């Protein structure tokens, strides 16, 4: 019994240690997770902080621009309370390479200060100033349809991740790129209009859109990355563009209802 108890204690201590260490750069570098109030973060060489976790149960949160004297410049895919409905980004965050709020099922509004140097919001939806890309659509918004504003250049990585209320999304002629996982797991999405301005559809852009039954891809699209329509189990009809030369791996993987696909003569591999 004593040996078993000692083993359990050692295991518990090891678990505590591991939960306070993260790995960066492909697992080659250890970073200690630091705690400041309701937030956990790691430090970078320049002294800036990367926010990892929010421990608060509050429904509305204003994220800090400083933690223990360190400027918060990066927000990772943070673990929030499932009750989060509104979040405000600090002015210190200069960029987001993907939507960090995909795990917030009740989130309805994302806010930034009017003078924020890098982002702006329209009706609670987050956009990047430098290129007018749509960065994050709150997955708790109850609207069934959404028209992306004219002037938007791209739908960013995971921008509509897990937005289960949306049945229809229309994209303006200004959009040129649909990024990786842009509409991933939009389980109610039935219709999406892709304008002839789009030239690239990213990896897994529409994967697990299980209600999507048909898709027409315009001739402007020259690249569709792997798995873009994987797990679209209701998809029955696809029209591929004449500009396409290659069908990427797993493009229609597990599309169990697919019965009609038009492959143009331009496709050689």
Residue ranges and their predicted role:
Residues 1-9:
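Bacterial N-terminal signal peptides that target proteins for export
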Residues 18-31:
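Sec-dependent signal peptide cleavage junction
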Residues 38-46, 56-73, 82-95, 103-125, ...:
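Structural signature of tandem-repeat unit edges
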Residues 77-78, 159:
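A short, well-ordered alpha-helical element
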């Amino acid at each position: 019994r004593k040996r078993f108890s000692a083993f359990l204690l050692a295991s518990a201590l090891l678990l505590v240690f591991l939960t306070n260490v993260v790995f960066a750069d492909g697992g080659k570098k250890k970073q200690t997770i630091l705690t400041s109030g309701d937030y956990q973060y790691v430090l970078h060489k320049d002294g800036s902080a990367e926010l990892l976790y929010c421990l608060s149960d509050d429904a509305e949160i204003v994220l800090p621009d400083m933690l223990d004297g360190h400027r918060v410049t990066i927000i990772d895919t943070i673990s929030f309370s499932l009750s989060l409905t509104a979040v405000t980004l600090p002015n210190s965050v200069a960029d987001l390479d993907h939507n960090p709020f995909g795990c917030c099922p009740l989130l309805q509004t994302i806010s930034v200060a009017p003078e924020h140097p890098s982002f702006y919001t329209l009706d609670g939806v987050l956009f990047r100033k430098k290129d007018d890309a749509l960065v994050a659509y709150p997955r708790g918004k109850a609207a069934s349809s959404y028209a992306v504003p004219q002037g938007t250049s791209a739908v960013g990585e995971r921008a509509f991740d897990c937005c289960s209320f949306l049945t229809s999304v229309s994209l303006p002629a200004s959009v040129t790129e649909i990024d990786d996982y842009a509409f991933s797991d939009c389980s109610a999405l039935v219709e999406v209009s892709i304008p002839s301005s789009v030239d690239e559809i990213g990896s897994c852009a529409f994967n697990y859109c299980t209600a999507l039954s048909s898709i027409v891809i315009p001739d402007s699209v020259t690249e569709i990355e792997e798995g873009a329509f994987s797990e679209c189990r209701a998809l029955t009809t696809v029209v591929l563009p004449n500009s396409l030369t290659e069908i990427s791996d797993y493009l229609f993987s597990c599309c169990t209802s697919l019965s009609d696909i038009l492959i143009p003569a331009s496709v050689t591999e």
